[in-house]
């Protein structure tokens, strides 16, 4: 898939389309962690929850608007196959764009786990891609409601629980689209760009209390959300959901405070990313800002 250099796809020279030995979730350690994954009923969200179970996370909250029964079964099976005790699974009917729904979820997580270590804001929406004058205002804004407002509401409600936890880590599901201006994608791509700034604000305001937030492009994954994408784009969705899921589990098994507020891509080889840590820190790279 060809992207302009400014999109950063090949900024790390070695890229992946599927999971690889370095990041395999079953080799990672998430013992003792309480994890919340939104949009967990299917797609990347469900696979991410499964990956945390494979890594031994004992407490998993799964949030979605649709049934989570299949996701719960997959999580329990994954933990068993990896040789871990069955995790405590909290299934939450959740609309991330609804303040009361999010507040209710936070209350249930607190009752069940007492705190939260890792929040994965995965729930998302993609509108039908058409030029601005042809957009439906309700559909256009609904994308922002889920992708940005949903991330804001979840972060806002879960921060008190994260501050009680050990890892205090937030992973926001982003997109390479934040760095693109594809005709027709005005709601999705502007919302993802705004999410990057929200990720930075989270760190600016809470890093002193130990909170870490970063955003990640999951790769080009063929999920249910992709149904509204143009056909030429759908044909390029060749990455596995396991690539992103395992990358997230690997990146959060040890606290990577230097990633605070930054944009990452699941396609990037993590060994090369880590090798460029000093370059990233010295240049304050992988953040949204005006370069003059």
From Swiss-Prot:
UniProt keywords (A-Z) are:
NADP, Oxidoreductase
Asked if the keyword Glycoprotein belongs to this entry, the reply reads no
Q: In which pathway does it act?
A: Mycotoxin biosynthesis
Tell whether tRNA-binding is among the UniProt keywords.
Answer: no
What's the domain of life for this entry? Answer: Eukaryota
**Coiled coil regions in record:** none
**Gene3D superfamilies per UniProt:** NAD(P)-binding Rossmann-like Domain (3.40.50.720)
Residues recorded as binding NADP(+), renumbered to this chain, are 37, 95, 122, 156, 188, 192, 221, 223
Q: Which SUPFAM superfamilies match?
A: NAD(P)-binding Rossmann-fold domains
Mind listing the GO molecular function terms for this protein?
Answer: oxidoreductase activity, acting on the CH-OH group of donors, NAD or NADP as acceptor
Active site: residue positions: 188 (proton donor), 192 (lowers pka of active site tyr)
Pfam families for the chain? adh_short
Phenotype of the disrupted gene, per the record: Leads to complete absence of citrinin production.
Q: What is its EC number?
A: 1.1.1.-
Described purpose of this protein according to its UniProt entry:
Short chain dehydrogenase; part of the gene cluster that mediates the biosynthesis of the mycotoxin citrinin, a hepato-nephrotoxic compound to humans due to inhibition of respiration complex III. The pathway begins with the synthesis of a keto-aldehyde intermediate by the citrinin PKS (pksCT also named citS) from successive condensations of 4 malonyl-CoA units, presumably with a simple acetyl-CoA starter unit. Release of the keto-aldehyde intermediate is consistent with the presence of the C-terminal reductive release domain.
Q: Which family does it belong to?
A: Belongs to the short-chain dehydrogenases/reductases (SDR) family.
- The name this protein carries in UniProt is Short chain dehydrogenase citE
- Supply the source organism's classification: Eukaryota, Fungi, Dikarya, Ascomycota, Pezizomycotina
GN (gene name): citE
């Amino acid at each position: 898939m060809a992207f302009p250099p400014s999109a950063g796809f090949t900024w790390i020279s070695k890229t992946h389309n599927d999971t690889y030995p370095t990041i395999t979730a079953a080799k990672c350690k998430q013992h003792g962690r309480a994890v919340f994954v939104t949009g967990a009923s299917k797609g990347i969200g469900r696979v991410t929850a499964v990956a945390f179970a494979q890594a031994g996370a004992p407490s998993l909250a799964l949030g979605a608007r649709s049934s989570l029964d299949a996701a719960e079964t997959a999580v329990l099976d994954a933990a068993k196959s990896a040789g871990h005790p069955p995790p405590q699974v909290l299934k939450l009917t959740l609309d991330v764009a609804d303040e009361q729904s999010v507040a209710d979820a936070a209350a249930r997580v607190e009752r069940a786990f007492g705190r939260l270590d890792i929040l994965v804001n995965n729930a998302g929406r993609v509108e039908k891609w058409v030029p601005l004058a042809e957009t439906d205002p309700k559909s256009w804004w609904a994308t922002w409601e889920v992708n940005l407002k949903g991330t804001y509401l979840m972060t806002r409600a879960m921060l008190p629980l994260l501050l009680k936890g050990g890892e205090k880590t937030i992973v926001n599901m982003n997109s390479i689209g934040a760095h693109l201006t594809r005709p027709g994608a005005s709601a999705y791509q502007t919302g993802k760009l705004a999410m990057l700034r929200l990720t930075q604000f989270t760190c600016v305001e809470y890093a002193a209390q130990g909170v870490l937030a970063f955003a990640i492009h999951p790769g080009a994954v063929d999920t249910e959300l992709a149904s509204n994408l143009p056909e030429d784009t759908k044909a390029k969705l060749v990455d596995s959901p396991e690539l992103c899921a395992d990358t997230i589990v690997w990146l959060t098994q040890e606290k990577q405070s230097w990633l605070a507020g930054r944009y990452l891509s699941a396609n990037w080889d993590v060994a090369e990313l880590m090798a460029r840590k000093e370059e990233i820190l010295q240049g304050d790279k992988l953040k949204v800002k005006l370069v003059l």
